[in-house]
Every structure is written in C-alpha cells, then in structure tokens.
Amino acid sequence: EMDRGIVICGTGIGISIAANKIKGVRCGLCTDPVMARLTREHNDANMLAMGARIIGGELARGIVKAFLETDFSNGKRHIDRINKITELERAK
C-alpha cells in the first residue's frame, strides 16, 4: 500500500484510464506543473500519469516535484467532490 504513485506510458492517456479503474485511485494526467499542483489541491489525486512521448525529462521532473510537494486543500467543495467520486466507486 502506498500514499502516491506515478505511472508513465506513451501519451499517459491509456495508463491513466487503467489506473482510475482501481478502487481508491484518483489518477491525474498532467502535462505541466500547474496541472500537477491543481490535481493534488482540488482532486486529492494520489497517482500521477505522464506521457513519455509528450513531455521531456526536465518538464517531467517539474511535474513530479509539483505533484509530490502539493497537499490537498481540504476545501469544502473539494471534499464534496472527493465524496462524490467515492460514491461513484461504490456504485460499481
């Protein structure tokens, strides 16, 4: 069991779709550090997906840094969003 994870494929699309099929995983496909920060702050994403064919090494390092250094905001609207996502998982 892990707190966070990082997955990579060619575009990041397929791996993010697959990761989001796993109960409890909230995987965000990010192509820049701003997206990584926002997916952590707003969606409490616990997995980061990136596309190796889409982004270079330096950009990838910036994305990973933003993802790992950002905490969930705990804002009410964001908590409500996470609760709705959890309900969708239970409905499967």
Model-derived segments and their meaning:
Residues 1-4:
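Short alpha-helical segments enriched in small residues
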Residues 7-53:
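Mid-chain, well-packed structural core segment of small domains
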Residues 33-92:
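C-terminal binding/interaction regions
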